């Protein structure tokens, strides 16, 4: 089975649209843009089909990993893209995710616990890693929402925007995301 989802932008996928902005509910397996593989369909091409305009611009204000689902904002013109990028750079926009994670061995975590992780991350060859020097600062906040046996539902809030930041930080806390083959344990059986 392919990990590439077909891109069907039905009415339920478009959460908001005006002349400057489109908010899209991205399914897992879908690329946000052509940066990874210019020959693969991505949300930008699907939005041009949705708009019925092959020359329309849809510029992602941020990205989600291919395997991640969630809301992605696209600017429909350069001035809107500039304004959105400024908001992300100045941190006037916040992002929050939910993830099911493996609990650390002998964890004393309970629902409502909050955790932070600060480190330096270096990204190369498709992987990010925590390093003592030579990386960029990364800061994440986490809240335990629910615990069920060996798993926990976490709210994850990146304070910086490093590649794979939340995945690396959760793995460093010995709480990798379930199903994360790159930074986590073996898949849940």
Segments from the language model and where they lie:
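RNA pseudouridine synthases
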Residues: 1-189
């Amino acid at each position: 089975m392919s990990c590439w989802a077909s891109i069907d932008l039905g009415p339920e996928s478009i959460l908001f649209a005006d002349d400057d902005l489109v908010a899209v509910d991205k399914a897992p397996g879908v690329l946000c843009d052509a940066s990874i593989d210019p020959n693969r369909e991505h949300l930008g091409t699907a939005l041009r089909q949705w708009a019925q305009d092959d020359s329309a611009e849809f510029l992602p204000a941020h990205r989600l990993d291919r395997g991640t689902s969630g809301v992605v904002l696209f600017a429909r013109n350069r001035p809107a893209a500039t304004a959105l990028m400024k908001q992300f750079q100045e941190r006037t926009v916040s992002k929050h995710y939910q993830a099911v994670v493996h609990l650390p061995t002998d964890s004393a975590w309970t629902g409502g616990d909050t955790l932070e992780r600060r480190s330096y991350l270096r990204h190369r060859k498709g992987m990010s890693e925590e390093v003592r020097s030579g990386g960029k600062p990364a800061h994440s906040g986490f809240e335990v929402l629910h615990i069920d046996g060996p798993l926990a539902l976490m709210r994850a809030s990146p304070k910086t925007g490093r590649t794979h930041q939340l995945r690396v930080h959760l793995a460093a806390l010995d709480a990798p995301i379930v199903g994360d083959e790159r930074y986590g344990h073996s898949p849940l059986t």
